[in-house]
Amino acid sequence: MDSDEEFIDNSLAVGDIVYDEAQIAQQQQEYAAQLKLASTAIPTVVKDFIQYFHRCLSDNSVYELHGCYENSFGKLTDKFYKNSHWPHPVAQVAPLVKNDPVFLYFYSELYYRHLYAKLTPTPLERFESYSNYCNLFNYILNSDGPVDLELPTSWAWGIVDEFIYQYNSYWMTKEAHNSDGVAPDTWGTYSVLNVLYSLSEKTKIREQLRAIKAGLDPMDVAGPYGSRPLYKMLGYFCVIGLLRVHTLLGDFTLALKTMESIELTKKALFARVAPAHFATYYYVGICYVMTRRYADAIRCFSHVLTYMARTKNVQGPRYDAKRSEQMYALLAICVVLSPARLDDSIHVALRDRYGDQMAAMQRGDLKLFEELFTFAAPKFIQPGDVHGGDPLKHHLKIFMVDVTNTLSTANLKSYLNLYATMDLGKLASFLDTDAEDLRSQLVTLKMKNRQLRWTEGELADGTYQHCSELDIALENDLIHVAEAKGGRKFADWFIRNTVKNYSVQDYIVNGDKKDKEKKN
């Protein structure tokens, strides 16, 4: 540096913290943006909605809150904020609600949820959303006793669901693996798990579910928190949230174990909220797929897909078309790896969507397995990976090992289907291999035909069962083949074709009248 040049220090020290010129400039821009937001006029109808929303939350008017959450917020979004932010919580909304901190927690939750859905959040906005969730859960968990607040069931699920979605979304970004980000501890895995475990334990939701299962009064074990509807709902949905987080982290056995005492039945609490219903079955099914329990995965996917197909027209915007397609793709994979008889309606829908792909996969097309798995799998994360590796590729690689081993026995099965007994050496000559290698293939086939299968109890429990129509036993060099085919169920076929028959007869009798009505 020349002696004539003058050094100008543009940094600023505030206590022990030193801000450089770039940081100060960034904060100036953010402050200017907030001032601009504050000066932007809020439409009268939006202002009235925010104030009405505030009154409903303060008065614990659950029915009115449900209308605000499910209907009004979405309609106003479409009219005014389809491609822009809602009014800023601090700069614009706080003065309208007398700086009510509780309302601002919940309004901010919706504000950032809308931002994630319609726009692209900046690193600062991701941090602000995380900070708001910290404040919200701190208020719920650490106030002096249970808070006097009630929410609609769908909103309680939405809070937990969005909390995990934003955590997942953060770890899919590059800045998550960069220690120089806005805040290194933003969306930490420990913090997220701590919230979910704290809510589920403080509400004693597992104890309540065990009491219900035993025919006892759950209020006897609920305690002061679990007896309140808000805490009970949040605690319950946090258990499903733990299933989801552990699945995203790749611990599939622990994910199933967190669902202790929650039964997959139509009477379960999650069945009251369609998105929760779909998510629960999807993540349980994924865990079964990744632990090679294909029969259980088929049972899960078949059940929820049947429900989704039957209620599609009444669900409206809550119908998750992408989730449905993902589960059909996973079901196709499972049926190829572990053939099973499906409900007739599901079989037809699956054949229409993936009939050609399934035929190709049965012939050993590994690329199709990879494509369907990549499309259908959740967005796995690996928070501790500073190198930013792709966890999806890691899980795909593990999954494809089992696929390759399973498909390696396909040619062997085609020969065994033709015989009741067969000499080991003769079959080895057919397959152009040696006897020892064939023994290894037979053991692989025997093991692949056995799966851990749920019958009763917890979701992670099960007994090893034979899950194939073909079974083998080896006596010295003689292979014994047993084939068990279950009886076909014709009820669905007769019902469906009877309905078609009636419709054809009706058209034959009244066809002219119906044609005239169409013309008119």
From Swiss-Prot:
SS bonds (residue pairs): none
Cell compartments where the protein resides: Cytoplasm
Domain PCI: 278-478
A Pfam short name: Paf67
Any GO BP: formation of cytoplasmic translation initiation complex
Any one cellular-component term (Gene Ontology): eukaryotic 43S preinitiation complex
Binding partners and assembly: Component of the eukaryotic translation initiation factor 3 (eIF-3) complex.
Family: Belongs to the eIF-3 subunit L family.
Physiological role: Component of the eukaryotic translation initiation factor 3 (eIF-3) complex, which is involved in protein synthesis of a specialized repertoire of mRNAs and, together with other initiation factors, stimulates binding of mRNA and methionyl-tRNAi to the 40S ribosome. The eIF-3 complex specifically targets and initiates translation of a subset of mRNAs involved in cell proliferation.
Protein name from the UniProt record: Eukaryotic translation initiation factor 3 subunit L
Native source organism of the sequence: Yarrowia lipolytica (strain CLIB 122 / E 150)
